[in-house]
């Protein structure tokens, strides 16, 4: 709840919104949730690198106004799609020659509060905000050499919270159906494997389709 209050206060100060308009601001903020998988691979002579891998994702978003006292979920979007990308390497200070090449999978549950960006009225909409990702689970898949078993569970100490910026763009195809494009830009080292000498943050691009459910009487 504190995070919600801080985010609303930040938007209010940024856009110079008065107290009278504070209620309208709350109605405009969207609560977003998403499940996705990030990847990082150890490569020969390179500390870590991203792979061009696609993974399915699914999510749910609703405006805060839909969670009112009347309990009417009047604007809920169900989102399905896939994400492209994964971890972006950084802070690699030396070259390491790996005898075993491995791929790390980390599954995240992302949530975010987003605010609509000022665009002309039309079929195109855009929102942005901060997201928080909690690691659900992770595993190591050997690519070549070393391991006998196909997958190894990743230790919880390697599963770091993911925090970053979210940009979402929608294009309305119908009153209930929209095309979605999302960009997640991690700000922290959500993957930290100091034993092998590298850290990484999330960089994810996703596309998909959203369906709007509404129980509001026309």
Model-derived segments and their meaning:
Residues 4-13:
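Sec-dependent N-terminal signal peptides
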Residues 16-70, 212-218:
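Short glycine/proline- and aromatic-enriched beta-strand/turn motifs that initiate or cap beta-hairpins
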Residues 23-29, 50-58, 103-109, 159-165, ...:
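Residues that define the transmembrane beta-barrel architecture of outer-membrane proteins
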Residues 27-33, 74-80, 109-111, 124-130, ...:
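Transmembrane beta-strands of outer-membrane beta-barrel proteins
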Residues 33-41, 64, 82-88, 105-108, ...:
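Transmembrane beta-strands of outer-membrane beta-barrel pores
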Residues 39-51, 84-106, 138-159, 190-200:
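Flexible, solvent-exposed loop segments that connect beta-strands
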Residues 59-65, 110-116, 168, 208-210:
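Outer-membrane beta-barrel architecture
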Residues 83, 154-218:
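Predominantly the C-terminal beta-signal and adjacent terminal strand-loop region
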